[in-house]
Swiss-Prot record:
<comment type="similarity">
    <text>Belongs to the intron maturase 2 family. MatK subfamily.</text>
</comment>
<keyword id="KW-0819">tRNA processing</keyword>
<keyword id="KW-0507">mRNA processing</keyword>
<dbReference type="Pfam" id="PF01348">
    <property type="entry name" value="Intron_maturas2"/>
</dbReference>
<dbReference type="GO" id="GO:0006397">
    <property type="term" value="P:mRNA processing"/>
</dbReference>
<dbReference type="GO" id="GO:0008380">
    <property type="term" value="P:RNA splicing"/>
</dbReference>
<dbReference type="GO" id="GO:0008033">
    <property type="term" value="P:tRNA processing"/>
</dbReference>
<dbReference type="GO" id="GO:0009507">
    <property type="term" value="C:chloroplast"/>
</dbReference>
<dbReference type="InterPro" id="IPR024942">
    <property type="entry name" value="Maturase_MatK_N"/>
</dbReference>
<keyword id="KW-0934">Plastid</keyword>
<dbReference type="Pfam" id="PF01824">
    <property type="entry name" value="MatK_N"/>
</dbReference>
<keyword id="KW-0150">Chloroplast</keyword>
<protein>
    <recommendedName>
        <fullName>Maturase K</fullName>
    </recommendedName>
</protein>
<keyword id="KW-0694">RNA-binding</keyword>
<dbReference type="InterPro" id="IPR024937">
    <property type="entry name" value="Domain_X"/>
</dbReference>
<dbReference type="InterPro" id="IPR002866">
    <property type="entry name" value="Maturase_MatK"/>
</dbReference>
<comment type="function">
    <text>Usually encoded in the trnK tRNA gene intron. Probably assists in splicing its own and other chloroplast group II introns.</text>
</comment>
Length: 508
């Protein structure tokens, strides 16, 4: 336990960040509003315009400076109708400003990484950098732990977690008071309607709180994973002899320390290494070990959540699957490890043999049905996948309509460039192109056939050109080579966020 504390002590920031005075500064709320940290929270309260936002902040700060705190009880709000109407709005402004302030210590860590000029740091920030890692490692593994990160989390646990990172007691007391007195919940993420609506209005703050909770979990888990060779199972009587075996190994190290091949043979007594991936509210642990080894880690994680976070973590939230029968849906891809059969013909003198080999291959596919459902929700097609016009864009200019449809089509092609089967994207491109044609035909009050006959299909292809065509036009002499390259999987490491249309399933 002391070793874990030393590890966390080195990992966390030791700077004294006094953030509480920033909450009373007007420019903090201006930054939170202008830099896009809030999604037009001012427009939700129609009684105020953007030009009056500074006046609202001054009013809020004056209430905070008063002896009677502005976070009053519901009984007081009944006596003051004006405050009852604007209570949610003031809390929303305050949460955005507080979220902006409390992110400052974490932003310093990012700046320090940039100043150190870490090699390929920008590439590591890409969400697509996960897939090359999966291609290199998952095909050689046997079992996988599928973990659903537990929630809800008590407010006090979140405040205690932030205490290790933010060395400002006043800010933490203010956050505790804000969460307990205003919303009066026992948890940040709860199924009640009141808490869910509150978290939607204050999305930036609660995303930060949830991510800090997950960061605490990952910090300790990384330490446990790196020290996994010292986590020995002693519960089974069959394995008790291993304790004496490790003691013998320690004595043998002093004797054979000069032998070169001794260190190479130590892997026989070490636990298999764990590969971990987290995406949103799920976490995956994969290993080449046995089912007994994975069950041991399952017990470790259940005990860890219950002891460190005081959370009842049901073992059913962790499932053990064999990797050959496991599929993974995340970041807009359906990934799995499948067997790729191959036949090798071998001939020795007059005898010929055929050897059937099955090679594991990490496969990534685009789930068409959920993607079509996302297009239907965005009003590009109906639920059956038939393209329809976009009436909201019918008042725009022709070039603007074509530019919007073309940008969506190119972004989807760019995002799903790592798909093993590119032909599945043709249906998506077809829906977008025909939806664009119907939108233009609706604007000009004509049919799609008449519109395309008058302007020609080349007019649409000019704006809805896929990455494949752009690649061939850029390098016309090597079109056959680039065609083979395009058909293979390409992971672009400049993608920092999931595509909106591909984010169809996992939403926090």
């Amino acid at each position: 336990m002391e070793e874990i504390q030393r590890y966390l002590h080195l990992e966390r920031s030791e700077q004294q960040d006094f953030l509480y005075p920033l909450i009373f500064q007007e420019y903090i709320y201006t930054f939170a509003h202008d830099r896009g940290f809030s999604r037009s929270i001012w427009s939700e309260n129609r009684g105020y315009e953007n030009k009056s936002s500074l006046l609202i902040v001054k009013r809020l700060i004056n209430r905070m400076d008063q002896e009677n705190h502005f976070l009053i009880s519901p009984n007081d709000s009944n006596q003051n109708p004006f405050w009852a109407c604007n209570k949610n709005f003031y809390s929303q402004i305050l949460s955005e400003g507080f979220a902006f302030s409390v992110e400052i210590p974490f932003s310093r860590r990012l700046i320090s990484c940039l100043e150190k000029k870490i090699v390929k740091f920008q590439n590591l920030r890409s969400i697509h950098s996960t897939f090359p890692f999966l291609e290199d490692n998952f095909s050689h593994l046997n079992f996988v732990l599928d973990i659903l990160i537990p929630h809800p989390v008590h407010v006090e646990i979140l405040v205690q977690t932030l205490r290790y990172w933010v060395k400002d007691a006043s800010s933490l007391h203010f956050l505790r008071f804000f969460l307990n007195e205003y919303c009066n919940w026992n948890s940040v993420i709860t199924p009640t309607k009141a808490s869910s609506s509150f978290s939607k209005r204050n999305q930036r703050l609660f995303l930060f709180l949830y991510n800090s909770h997950v960061c605490e979990y990952e910090s300790i888990f990384v330490f446990l994973r790196n020290q996994s060779s010292y986590l020995r199972s002693t519960s089974s009587g069959v394995l008790l002899e291993r304790i004496y075996f490790y003691g013998k190994i320690k004595r043998l190290v002093n004797v054979f320390v000069k032998l070169k091949d001794f260190q190479a043979n130590l892997w026989l007594v070490k636990e298999p290494y764990l590969h971990s991936i987290r995406y949103q509210r799920k976490s995956i642990l994969a290993s080449k070990g046995t089912s007994l080894f994975m069950n041991k880690w399952k017990c470790y994680l259940v005990t860890f959540w219950q002891s460190h976070f005081s959370l009842w973590f049901h073992p059913r939230r962790i499932s053990i699957n064999q990797l050959s029968n496991y599929s993974l849906d995340f970041l807009g891809y359906h990934s799995s490890v499948r067997m790729n059969p191959s036949v090798v013909r071998s001939q020795i003198l007059e005898n010929a043999f055929r050897i059937n080999n099955a090679i594991k291959k990490f496969d990534t596919l685009v789930p068409i049905i959920p993607l079509v459902a996302s297009l239907a929700k965005a009003k590009f097609c109906n639920v059956l996948g038939h393209p329809i016009s976009k009436p909201v864009w019918a008042d725009l200019s022709d070039s603007n309509i074509l530019d919007r449809f073309g940008r969506i089509c190119r972004n989807l092609s760019h995002y799903h460039s790592g798909s093993s089967k590119k032909k599945s994207l043709y249906r998506i491109k077809y829906i977008l192109r025909l939806s664009c044609a119907r939108t233009l035909a609706r604007k000009h009050k004509s049919t799609v056939r008449t519109f395309l006959k008058r302007l020609g299909s080349v007019f649409l292809e000019e704006f809805l050109m896929s990455e494949e065509n752009v690649l061939f036009l850029t390098f016309p002499k090597a079109s056959s080579t680039f065609r083979r390259v395009y058909r293979s999987r390409i992971w672009y490491l400049d993608i920092l966020s999931i595509n909106d249309l591909a984010n169809y399933k996992y939403k926090l």
